Amino acid sequence: MDIFGILTMVGGLALFLFGMNAMGQGLEKLSGSRLERILEKMTSNPFKAIMLGALVTAVIQSSSATTVMVVGFVNSGIMKLSQAIGVIMGANIGTTMTSWLLSLTGIQGDSLFMQLLKPSSFTPILAIIGIFFIMMSKSSKKKDIGTILMGFAILMFGMETMSNAVAPLADNEQFTHILTMFSNPVLGVIAGAILTAVIQSSSASVGILQAMCATGAVTYSTALPIIMGQNIGTCVTALLSAIGANKNAKRAALVHLYFNLIGTIVFMVLFYIINAIFPFEFFDQSANQAGIAILHSVFNIFATIIWLPFMKLLEKLAYISVRDKKDDNAPANEFQILDPRFLATPSVALEQCKSVAVRMADCARDTLKLSMGLISKYNDRDVEIVNENEEKVDVYEDKLGSYLLQLGSKNLTPGDSQTVNMLLHCISDFERISDHAVNISECAKEMHTKGLSFSKKAIEEIHIFNGALNEILDTAITAFEHGDIEQAKSVEPLEEVIDNLRTEIRNRHVKRLRKGKCTIEMGFVLTDLITNYERVADHCSNIAVCMIQIHDNSFDTHSYISDLKATNNEEFRRKFTVFSEKYMLPDAKKTD
């Protein structure tokens, strides 16, 4: 093979790997986080775990990616090790899908039907449709479909380029001699493992082997040990991802290794013993692309079947390899679900961000309600809890914000990118709500320390204000947690009512001050209190408006709120009226 032949082969390999990556990314984006959500909610049913593991891997075209994802789930405590075993088994079956697709390049025959099945017949059409969707469509889903079609077309073109480049090697004695060496089971396994470990994809390494079949020099006796080695080499990705993870995550990576390593040993021992007694006629024949796909599938299905009754043994083997220590019973870090491993699969990472953001929102809400209760019933321990929770919310903002910024730099769909931006805005508002909770607790502490108290009328007004603030807080956070846009639309009318409440309570305080029914010192406390209440309502409004804007694909906050209030929006006015009546202060003439 001359230099041009080598360049053609390497170029074909580059196109092949690029096409596989593009197709996998397109499939992953199109499926969104649905498949990952299914994995997160995995039951202990091993058959269901195997099927779902195979499905996810067939979709994202990478058993390594699935296994790394599983290692992340186990590391963050989302998935148990026993559940992970079934998914890992299924991933090994799902990864054979690529080899079956690539086997289409080996189709021979002159009939119309056989011609239509050849990639050279239909991939140009797929490429044209794909590039049309990518360049002309505004829909992100159609763009993803276009990416899948283009990726598949490039994958097949790269495969054919590699096959054509290596075809002349059929007459090369040195090449034939090298392949004959790999018919030695040990050398073949080592070669397959090294190749797969280097390119980090068993699907790609099997594809390269299928391309080599074009030379006619690859026999099944050579291909079998190489395929076995490829299944072992793919474990390197998961083992590397487990570095720095907890013990269960390391065990999950070892399960993947043991599954393939022991499965390979058992399969090869049985195969060569049977072949020695009853020689397989096909063993010394030239392999073709379909034959490679069959061998790849048979091994992975065989390994799954023999391990299925011994899943507990596989789990025990992992526990023996990575033993627990006495100090390993420390509580899990709640930020473990923000695992860097998930960043390789943005839809999974985004789901974890949402989960942490919900916890942060609940913590901020609980902190605010606790501080509001201190106004009527003060105790030092609750003040300490408010301060502790505020620090906890600060940590949430720091950890989650940093993770979201890392996630935002990844190749996200437009929808996921908008969700990341929404979360970044909302966690800032949650943090500010907890800050106002501390301010409110300081108002309560000042009143307690100085022996101050509100007048009866002021207490009645604050009680009504408390009700309105509790409702807007619950409405905004519940809407955020459930993605409920209709509920979010109830926040702004209530925020307008709260603004009016603050103004009216302040005016009433001034009247009482003039009549000598209230002191200036209490006036300062009251002003601080209702100002913090009103600011909390503003942050609730920010959260709701951000959700609505992303849903409506409109990002001018000032214009949105101005238009909402200025255009006599019927829904806004109706809700405003309902909330105004619900949180109406006692009649001024009677109270003053």
Where do the protein language model's features map onto the residues?
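Cytosolic, long alpha-helical scaffolding segments
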Residues: M79, T105, V218, G244-K250, ...
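Short helix-coil transition sites and intra-membrane helix breaks within transmembrane domains
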Residues: G24-E28, T57-A65, V166-A167, L195-A204, ...
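Membrane-embedded alpha-helical segments of transport systems
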Residues: V59-T66, I85-L102, P119-P124, L155, ...
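Hydrophobic core segments of alpha-helical transmembrane domains in multi-pass membrane transport
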Residues: T8-A22, G53-T57, I125-S137, M150-M162, ...
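Membrane-interfacial helix-loop connectors
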Residues: M69-A91, S99-S121, M159, T196-G233, ...
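Hydrophobic alpha-helical transmembrane segments of multi-pass integral membrane proteins
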Residues: M42-M69, P185-I208
